């Protein structure tokens, strides 16, 4: 199982960028490790108590299968707890009531979650995965 020490120097720079830049974007090419880079930054932010509840917005397939599996593949992120907020409204509500580090929702349900929480937004950090798919 790979460890944090096996990340590339450019990934360490991206992690530092996320950590020091509250509103940022990572525009790195396909296969350059944006997911594990972001997960590592999330671990650092949780450890420093800068954030406690993270929402990741991703395409449905990615929301259901990528983030939690990638975290499980690395020594330093395997402890992260996830809740996948997809499916029927009943399933999404159940997923939101779990106590975890990271909630992952598909982009089609962004309006729903915003309406659901209204003025009591509980997330300290939002990650938009596949940002180019948010064209309008």
Predicted regions and their residues:
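SF2 helicase/translocase NTPase motor core
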Residues: 1-136
């Amino acid at each position: 199982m790979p460890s944090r020490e096996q990340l590339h120097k450019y990934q360490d720079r991206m992690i530092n960028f996320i950590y020091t830049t509250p509103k940022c974007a990572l525009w790195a090419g396909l296969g350059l490790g944006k997911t594990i880079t972001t997960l590592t930054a999330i671990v650092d932010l949780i450890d420093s108590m800068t954030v406690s509840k993270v929402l990741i917005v991703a395409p449905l397939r990615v929301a259901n299968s990528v983030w939690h599996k990638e975290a499980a593949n690395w020594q330093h992120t395997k402890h992260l707890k996830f809740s996948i907020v997809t499916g029927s409204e009943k399933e999404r509500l159940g997923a939101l009531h779990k106590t975890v580090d990271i909630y992952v929702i598909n982009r089609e349900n962004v309006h729903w979650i915003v309406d659901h929480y209204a003025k009591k937004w509980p997330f300290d950090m939002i990650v938009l995965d596949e940002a180019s798919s948010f064209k309008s």
